[in-house]
Every structure is written in structure tokens, then in C-alpha cells.
Amino acid sequence: NLLIDIQKSMDELREEDWKDYEENIYPQKLLFDEPWLRYLIQYPKVWLDMPNTWERRKNQKVNDLPKSIDKDNYPNYYLRNFHHQTDGYLSDFSASIYDLQVDILFNGSANSMRRRILKPLKEGLLKFCNRKNSSIKILDVATGSGRTLKQLRGAFPKEKIIGLDLSDSYLKEASRHISDLDGDLIELIKGNAENLPFEDNSLQGVSCVYLFHELPRTIREKVLKEFFRVLEPGGILVLADSIQIIDSPNFISIMEGFYKNFHEPFYCDYIKDNIDSKMGEVGFNNVYSKSFFMTKVWSAIK
């Protein structure tokens, strides 16, 4: 029964989340970090925007983007209404309601799934424990509205954390989201994962959450090569994205529904793509993957 499988998987995710807190991977406050007041304010905006989403879905208007944007600044695969959402990723309005939309989609489990990157990242960075914490650099690629950055800062209070994204609007939302965090300011950079603005061997950790299913196959490979380039030897990559058919066959109907009901043109290819193999081909070692509810997490060492 699909509903039983879903509930069981969600329960296992919550148990994993609590266990990682008990192992001091991150502080307890992250477990109760949902911005309920902001969600309450944004909820009417989400509902009022739904007719626009339905209209785009019905008429397959997948390139309904703000006329003010300079399309030359973005790759073609990015210039679309992913999820049929208003303005794609290219407006302040889209950025302001995105987190709530994701939490509705995942039944409040989005942050728990994001936190699954923290344990492998923390374990991978232990090899640099003889260095000052402030000298360790962690880059979060496709940082979006900054939810992952907040999780990273909770687990890594003294390390240098950088968030990179293509969208000015989402970087602005990320800046708002992380403005009250303790510790050094997190640096935000506009940039493309295909051409990271960092020198070779300059980072110790790279995280990337929910990007790969929105990339064409050839671009996924290109981005993995960039991750490998910027990491120093011994550095760790932790990637989190949608589950795949190979390890979550009981959720195939959910994956198919996601592909059909949301505008996700690269998702059908993604759920069949052998990311583990691609990581090895790029040069990564110790590739490991595990699924948690609707999210699959990979870790790999340069």
C-alpha cells in the first residue's frame, strides 16, 4: 500500500533527523526551525496564485517569464516555469513563496530532508580537523532561498560558508533568511554551477540540494566536473536530490506523477541516471548514496 509506505518512510526520516541531533551533528533548534509566522503571511499568496499555475499547466505555457529579465544572462534550460510556478525562479514573488510551496509538496518534511547532507559533510570534513575551523570553506551550489545555508550554519558555526545561485531574487530572499544567524556572515554569490567562480583545489566541502533533477544530462556531467575541480584533494561533495527508480521502486508512481503534473522536463531522465557512476568517471572516490523519504543523498571524496 503506497500510503503505508509513505508514512513509514516519513517516520524513518524523522527518526534519522532526531538521531543526528543526538549525535551532535547539529543543534536541536534546527529541528524546530519552521518559519510558521512567515508561512501564515505567505499562505494567501500561494492560494491566490494557484489559478495562474493551473492556467499555465492547462495551456502548457512553460516559458511565461518576466519581460524585464535579460535572457542572455541565463542558460536556456533555466528559462522556464519549473513546477509551472509564476515567473520560474526569476522574480521576488516567486522567491517569497517558494519555501512554503515546497513544504506543502513534501508535507512539512523539506528541512528534514535537507539536513541529511549534514552528517556526511561533517564526517568528510574531519580529515581537515588539524586546521582552523575558519579556514574551512563550504560552498552550497544552487542555494536558492537559503534554507540549506541555515542548516549548514547550524552544523558548522565557525566555518566559512558560501551560497551560490543564478537568481538575483532568490539570493535576495536568501540574504533575508540568513540575516539573523549567529557567526560570521555567509557570503552570497551570483553564479552558474557550470562555471564556478573559484580556483582549482580551493574548497574543502561542496553541497548541492535539489539541483540535478532540473539539469539536462550533459549539464549534470559538466557540473560534477566543476565540483571536482574546485575541491582540494580529500575534499567532500554531498549532493541531495529526488529519489531515483533504482533504489525507490515502490515510489515509481509518485515520481511519474511529479513528472506529469509539474513542468520538470529533465526529471524523467534524471530518475534513471546513474549519478554514482558519473561521480566515479569524473574522479571521485568513496561514492556512497542513501535515500530518505523523497530525497536521495550522495557523498563522494576527491
Range-by-range predicted roles:
Residues G205-T218:
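A short SAM/SAH-binding and catalytic strip from SAM-dependent methyltransferases
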Residues E194-V206:
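A short acidic, Gly/Pro-enriched loop at the edge of an enzyme's catalytic core
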Residues S134-G144:
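Conserved class I S-adenosyl-L-methionine
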Residues L139, R147-N195:
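Class I SAM-dependent methyltransferase SAM/SAH-binding core
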Residues I97, G108-K132:
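Conserved alpha-helix/loop element of class I SAM-dependent methyltransferases that forms part
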Residues E221, V238-V282, V287-S291:
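C-terminal alpha-helical "lid/dimerization" subdomain adjacent to the S-adenosyl-L-methionine
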Residues N1-D72:
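N-terminal accessory segments
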Residues E221-P233:
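A short glycine-rich, Lys/Arg-flanked "PGG" loop and its adjoining helix->strand segment in the class I
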